[in-house]
Curated annotation (Swiss-Prot):
This is Translation initiation factor 6. SMART domains: eIF6. SUPFAM superfamilies: Pentein. The lineage of its organism: Archaea, Methanobacteriati, Methanobacteriota, Stenosarchaea group, Methanomicrobia. InterPro entries: eIF6. Belongs to the eIF-6 family. HAMAP family: eIF_6. Keywords: Initiation factor, Protein biosynthesis. Pfam families: eIF-6 (PF01912). Binds to the 50S ribosomal subunit and prevents its association with the 30S ribosomal subunit to form the 70S initiation complex. It comes from Methanocella arvoryzae (strain DSM 22066 / NBRC 105507 / MRE50).
């Protein structure tokens, strides 16, 4: 199932929300009708909470079927809601916007090159994936420069051949380049996707949507 939805009048659904195959995390003040559409489209349960008292959930956290990595500033009451759906680990240090720093699915994670060995070990243990440092399109904020499901990966259009090869080797999935919202290269900022459904903002064009569908495995060959 594929839908185009905006949050708060903006197309950046990947900044205001985060999801795994099982659950989508949404701000408490999002209209219930929108929440219902998101859950139906992605085929997930819903957790409604802020992260670090912020609606920028997609920037502050990431996760997969095994657990969640969140900002070190995440409140206990916020983490407790997530813990009903998996282990929660706080990212320690100065860089805590986990959603910006980590691109993950159920088998692998690419992370910001400056993340510490200790943080990488924590990510490996919580998400139960192989972790590698890297960039996408020269950007260290790989979480916003890409979108990964268990079927495929879409990344920044300026990703180099070397970066694409690293991603394909790490995730063992097809990788393609594309844009969202009429030319934005930060594809992770405007996509929420599982293997069952896909949401992007209303500014994403038809050709962009076709590329997204193809990259994330929604078009059968």
């Amino acid at each position: 199932m594929i839908r185009q939805i905006d949050f708060y009048g903006y197309p950046y659904v990947g900044i205001y929300a985060a999801n795994t195959e099982q659950v989508v995390v949404l701000p408490p003040d999002l209209p219930q009708a929108t929440v219902d559409l998101v859950a139906e489209t992605l085929g997930t349960a819903v957790v409604r909470t802020l992260i670090n008292e912020s609606t920028l959930i997609g920037s502050m956290m990431t996760g997969n079927s095994n657990g969640f990595i969140v900002s070190d500033l995440t409140l206990d009451r916020e983490a407790n809601l997530l813990q009903e759906h998996g282990k929660v680990t706080r990212l320690k240090g100065k860089m805590t916007a986990a959603g910006n720093l980590i691109l993950a699915n159920d088998t692998a994670a690419l992370v910001h090159p400056a993340l510490t060995d200790k943080n990488i070990e924590a990510i490996e243990k919580t998400l139960k994936v192989e972790v590698r440092r890297g960039t996408i399109g020269g950007l260290k904020t790989v979480g916003m420069a890409g979108c990964a499901t268990n079927k495929g990966i879409l990344v920044h259009p300026r990703a180099t051949e070397e970066e694409l090869t690293v991603l394909e080797d790490l995730f063992k999935l097809p990788v393609d380049i594309g844009t969202v919202s009429f030319g934005s290269p930060l594809v992770g900022s405007a996509i929420l996707a599982t293997t069952k459904g896909l949401i992007t903002g209303t500014r994403t064009s038809g050709p962009e949507l076709g590329r997204i569908e193809d990259a994330l495995g929604f078009i059968e060959e």
